[in-house]
Structure formats: C-alpha cells, structure tokens
C-alpha cells in the first residue's frame, strides 16, 4: 500500500527513504538474501519481507563546497605537485607567484573554477577569478 506521504517522499535523485512493514507498521531494515543474492527489506517484529527496488540503502550528500575559500588549506603552497604561475599577482600583497588548482563547485552544471593561493609565507591569501 503506497500512501501520499510515500509518493511525495520517494522521488528525486539519490533518495533513499524509510520503509514500513505492511503487516505491523514497524520499520523495515535492509537485509541480504544470500541464497538469491538480492537485497530485501525485512521487519524485525514479524516475518514480512519485500524485495528492494534499488541496491542503494544509504546516501551521504556532502554539502560542503570548495567555493568556500576558507576551507582551502594554506599549506598547499608547499605542495610540489601543484602548478605555479606568475601571471596572477596576489590581490592582497601583490606577490607575483601563486599555486593554483581547478575544482568543480557543488552544482554540476557550473563550470570548473581556478583557485589561487599566494606563495608568500606571510600572506597565503586565497582567491578565485
């Protein structure tokens, strides 16, 4: 039996919802059927089981965005694998050299961005253009 609540809360990409037993209304828990190698949802109160419609039982969405410049660690200036440029002077101290790297923001439809970190040990200002 599908309720209006179920329909409204089981749509959208990556949604993994809570399922309830049709017999006793207790919560169903993921369980492996080892013999048939399928994922089931089983009630711990009665013997009710239902086959899962997806192999995903948990989604962890990370909402942190690299766009938040405060999360860029200034120690990246010591990373020898990062490229360096002298074409983008630091807007804070005017030092000529900066390390840079490319990253995508939270929204996949946006373009990749270049992030810069000033290599001046006394500055380590972070910016993007």
From Swiss-Prot:
Zinc finger (TFIIS-type): 86-128
Superkingdom assignment: Eukaryota
Signal peptide: none
Zinc finger (C4-type): 21-46
Keyword line: DNA-directed RNA polymerase, Metal-binding, Nucleus, Transcription, Zinc, Zinc-finger
SUPFAM superfamilies recorded: Zinc beta-ribbon
SMART domains reported for this sequence: RPOL9 (SM00661), ZnF_C2C2 (SM00440)
GO MF entry, a single one: DNA-directed RNA polymerase activity
GO (cellular component) term, any one: nucleolus
InterPro entries assigned: DNA-dir_RNA_pol-M_15_CS (IPR019761), Rpa12/Rpb9/Rpc10/TFS (IPR012164), Zn_ribbon_RPB9 (IPR001529), Zn_ribbon_RPB9_C (IPR034012), Znf_TFIIS (IPR001222)
Compartment(s) where it occurs, according to its Swiss-Prot or TrEMBL record: Nucleus, Nucleolus
Complex and partners: Component of the RNA polymerase II (Pol II) complex consisting of 12 subunits.
Family membership noted in the UniProt record: Belongs to the archaeal RpoM/eukaryotic RPA12/RPB9/RPC11 RNA polymerase family.
Function: DNA-dependent RNA polymerase catalyzes the transcription of DNA into RNA using the four ribonucleoside triphosphates as substrates. Component of RNA polymerase II which synthesizes mRNA precursors and many functional non-coding RNAs. Pol II is the central component of the basal RNA polymerase II transcription machinery. It is composed of mobile elements that move relative to each other. RPB9 is part of the upper jaw surrounding the central large cleft and thought to grab the incoming DNA template.
Protein name: DNA-directed RNA polymerase II subunit RPB9
